[in-house]
Each structure stands twice: as structure tokens, then as C-alpha cells.
UniProtKB/Swiss-Prot annotation:
Binds 1 zinc ion. Keywords: ATP-binding, DNA-binding, Metal-binding, Nucleotide-binding, Repressor, Transcription, Transcription regulation, Zinc, Zinc-finger. This is Transcriptional repressor NrdR. It comes from Polynucleobacter necessarius subsp. necessarius (strain STIR1). Negatively regulates transcription of bacterial ribonucleotide reductase nrd genes and operons by binding to NrdR-boxes. One of its GO terms (biological process) is negative regulation of DNA-templated transcription. Its cofactor is Zn(2+).
Length: 148
């Protein structure tokens, strides 16, 4: 592991610990050259599928984009950030469980709507109105009836 201070390649591991969740290893290291200490984290990198948009273009999956979309729908709603993080984790687990290299954006949108419906009905309607491109009041009424 290269030292972030002097870029020397010779470093020594002083301490190794597994996180409480068991999915990350924390290593405390010391540089043999400059003697500075630093911490590294090791975790399994899971390859989430590429997203195929409606126009056929492909984009890399973005955790940040998913999180910002959900948070935008939940803006000014009383939903804890832990609940949001758990929902995002469930969506990502579902995407991984499909075992596909590519997945249509519509499928991701449906997963988001399912989670929002569980978290907050108002956020669900907000997201659905944009995602489903509601054009009129009848579209809103139809979505509201689905919630009842």
C-alpha cells in the first residue's frame, strides 16, 4: 500500500479490525520511510448492473443519483436518514440479485417506487408524478387510488 504522505510503497500493517457489520476491514498502517500513520479500509466491491435508459443509451449505475432522487422525493418529509439508507441498500441488493449486467431504468424506477410507497405515501406520489410523467389530474387521482 502506497503512503499517502510520501508515496513510498513500503508500509507496515499495525492493526487489523473487522467492522461491526462484518463487511469492512480497517487496517492501521505505518510508512517505513516517513513513519507517518494512516488508515485504510477494505471491502468487497460488487458490480452493480449498467442502466439502460429509455432512449437506449447505457450509463454506469450511480449510488449518488439513486440517493439524490429518493431524497428529493422525501424533501421536507419526516423520514430518518437511516430509513433512506436502508431503502437504498434494499434496492441495490435487489439489483445485484438479478444477476444481470444491464438493467432497464424502468425497473430501477419501479424498485424506487416500491420503497417510497413503503416509506412515505406523499414522497411516492411526488416521485411517481415525475417518473410516470403525469399529464393531468386524472393521472394523480389514479395513483392516489393505488395507495388506498
Amino acid at each position: 500500500m502506497r503512503c499517502p504522505f510520501c508515496h513510498n510503497e513500503d508500509t507496515q500493517v499495525l492493526d487489523t479490525r473487522v467492522s461491526d457489520e462484518g463487511d469492512t476491514i480497517r487496517r492501521r498502517r505505518r510508512c517505513a520511510k516517513c513513519d507517518k500513520r494512516f488508515t485504510t479500509y477494505e471491502r468487497v466491491e460488487l458490480a452493480l448492473p449498467a442502466i439502460v435508459k429509455k432512449n437506449g443509451s447505457r450509463v454506469e449505475y450511480s449510488h449518488d443519483k439513486l440517493a439524490s432522487s429518493i431524497k428529493l422525493a422525501l424533501r421536507k418529509r419526516s423520514v430518518s436518514s437511516d430509513s433512506v439508507d436502508e431503502s437504498i441498500a434494499r434496492i441495490e441488493e435487489k439489483l445485484l440479485s438479478f444477476g444481470e449486467k444491464e438493467i432497464p431504468s424502468e425497473r430501477v424506477g419501479e424498485l424506487v417506487m416500491r420503497e417510497l410507497k413503503r416509506l412515505d405515501k406523499v414522497a411516492y406520489i411526488r416521485f411517481a408524478s415525475v417518473y410516470r410523467s403525469f399529464a393531468d389530474i386524472e393521472s394523480f387521482e389514479s395513483a392516489l387510488k393505488e395507495l388506498k
